[in-house]
């Protein structure tokens, strides 16, 4: 298996001066070890392209533990909020081409995170499905999110104009993160945020979004909540 070969691969990679590849193998090995101990609605996903290497370990039924490293400090902070306020156990390691710009890293993390949730959720039976008007305030900012976990993909997002960057996070990627995540996982989401401070607007939106997602994914005793028989 992977763990049996990983040390050999790392040694060969370092010998050939492929430090990034050796690091990627180390990350994947640690994630594989961690995934063995998770038995709830969980998944381990990796995604590798010429632009990024993303590794995500997710436990939906967690307690909000996290280990996040994307190379973008503010993005890390938002993903930590995502894990904590959604009560998801979440490990993310991203190695991206940040020497070019931030776009590929943020987009690919969103896509891989959507894949991780999709794998962990499975057929979507026995979940609440809906979360309506999950509202959160942060000083002058208020954000409200509603979700339907039926597999009809749509995002309607209303948010004030932001300054170009919050920390090292380009705000043109703010909505794009949610688009990429929602398109990959497949559900309907309405986001409405009002405020003045760009930091507050982004953070309040991430928090209300993850709280809504957590409620929509909460387990119940019902079968699939649809007369169609599928979501």
Language-model-detected regions and their locations in the chain:
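Acidic, Mg2+-coordinating phosphoryl-transfer loop and its flanking beta/alpha structural elements
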Residues: 1-12
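Structural preference for solvent-exposed beta-strand-turn elements
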Residues: 18-21, 27-231
């Amino acid at each position: 298996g992977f763990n049996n070969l990983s040390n050999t691969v790392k040694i060969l990679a370092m010998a050939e001066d492929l430090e990034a590849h050796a690091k990627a193998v180390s990350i994947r090995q640690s994630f594989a070890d961690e995934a063995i101990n998770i038995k709830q609605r969980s998944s381990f996903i990796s995604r590798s392209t010429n632009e990024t290497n993303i590794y995500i370990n997710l436990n939906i039924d967690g307690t909000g533990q996290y280990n996040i490293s994307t190379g973008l400090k503010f993005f890390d902070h938002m993903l930590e909020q995502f894990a904590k306020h959604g009560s998801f156990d979440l490990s993310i390691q991203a190695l991206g081409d940040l020497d070019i710009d931030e776009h590929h890293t943020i987009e690919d993390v969103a896509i891989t995170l959507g894949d991780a949730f999709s794998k962990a959720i499975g057929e979507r039976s026995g979940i609440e499905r809906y979360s309506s008007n999950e509202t959160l305030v942060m000083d002058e900012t208020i954000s409200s999110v509603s979700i339907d976990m039926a597999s009809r993909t749509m995002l309607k997002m209303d948010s004030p104009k932001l300054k170009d960057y919050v920390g090292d996070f380009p705000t043109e990627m703010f909505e794009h993160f949610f688009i990429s995540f929602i398109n990959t996982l497949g559900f309907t989401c309405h986001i409405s945020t009002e405020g003045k401070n760009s930091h507050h607007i982004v953070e309040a939106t991430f928090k209300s979004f993850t709280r809504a997602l957590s409620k929509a994914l909460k387990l119940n005793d019902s079968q699939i909540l649809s007369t169609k028989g599928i979501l």
